[in-house]
Swiss-Prot record:
Signal sequence range: 1-25
Protein location: Host endoplasmic reticulum membrane
BP GO annotations: symbiont-mediated suppression of host innate immune response
Name under which the protein is recorded: Uncharacterized protein UL147A
Membrane spanning stretches: 55-75
GO cellular component entries: host cell endoplasmic reticulum membrane; membrane
Keywords: Host endoplasmic reticulum, Host membrane, Host-virus interaction, Inhibition of host innate immune response by virus, Membrane, Signal, Transmembrane, Transmembrane helix, Viral immunoevasion
Functional note: Plays a role in the down-regulation of the host NKG2D ligand MICA by targeting ER-resident MICA to proteasomal degradation prior to the GPI-anchoring step. In turn, MICA reduction diminishes NK-cell killing of HCMV-infected cells.
Membrane topology: Single-pass membrane protein
Organism whose genome encodes this protein: Human cytomegalovirus (strain Merlin) (HHV-5)
Gene name as annotated: UL147A
Length: 75
């Protein structure tokens, strides 16, 4: 494969990893289990918010897996 395609694949994978870690960091920041949250003021998210967080975490994980497969196929 061309060096260009390898660079594009690795760049895509690094962008997907960055995006997914930012999603997971945002979810962790909003959770009550985070050490930076004052537990007295913490409210558990309702079911809709929890489902959205689960969906976003699954999306982030899927993006990293697909990106890894892409890089594996290209390289």
């Amino acid at each position: 494969m061309s060096l260009f395609y390898r660079a594009v694949a690795l760049g895509t994978l690094s962008a997907l990893v960055w995006y997914s870690t930012s999603i997971l960091a945002e979810i962790n920041e909003n959770s009550c289990s985070s050490s930076s949250v004052d537990h007295e003021d913490c409210e558990e998210p309702d079911e809709i918010v929890r489902e959205e967080q689960d969906y976003r975490a699954l999306l982030a994980f899927s993006l990293v897996i697909c990106g890894t497969l892409l890089v594996t196929c290209v390289i």
